[in-house]
């Protein structure tokens, strides 16, 4: 939010920029709660897209989109699974390899059969 203000002493006008705080707690699998971390979200996407032809700008856009979607929920808590589902949805349309990398950690593939099954569902 951009605001024009005036100094009470000298009457000089100046501009301030304010950002709305976004307090969101993430409910983990074990029911622990921790504050939402944009950096943690971004790092998980960076890891999945490593050595892929994906610009940091695209990664930032995905993070921005997901964060905005979470803000639009107007809720103070969200399950980590719902955040992971959003990441997977974005990666699936962006880059299949990045999607599989993320899915292998997120869905906790136990063996090659789990990976093969996920690949089959992508076709």
What is each stretch, according to the model?
Residues 1-6:
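Short metal-coordination and nucleic-acid-contact micro-motifs, chiefly zinc-binding Cys/His arrays
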Residues 34-35, 56-59, 73-81, 105-109:
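Conserved phosphate/pyrophosphate-binding and hydrolysis machinery centered on Walker-type P-loop NTPases
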Residues 60-73, 84-89:
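Amphipathic alpha-helical segments that form the core helices of the histone-fold
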Residues 81-82, 86-92, 98-100, 104-123:
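Long C-terminal interaction/binding lobes of large macromolecular proteins
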């Amino acid at each position: 939010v951009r605001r024009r203000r005036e100094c009470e002493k000298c009457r000089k006008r100046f501009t301030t920029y304010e950002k709305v705080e976004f307090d969101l707690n993430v409910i983990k699998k074990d029911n622990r709660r921790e504050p939402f971390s944009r950096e943690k979200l971004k790092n998980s996407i960076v890891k999945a897209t490593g050595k892929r032809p994906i610009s940091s700008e695209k990664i930032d856009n995905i993070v921005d989109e997901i964060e905005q979607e979470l803000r639009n929920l107007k809720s103070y808590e969200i399950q980590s699974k719902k955040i992971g589902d959003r990441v997977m949805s974005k990666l699936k349309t962006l880059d299949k390899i990045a999607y599989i990398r993320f899915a292998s950690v997120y869905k906790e593939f136990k063996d090659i059969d789990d990976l093969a099954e996920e690949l089959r569902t992508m076709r």
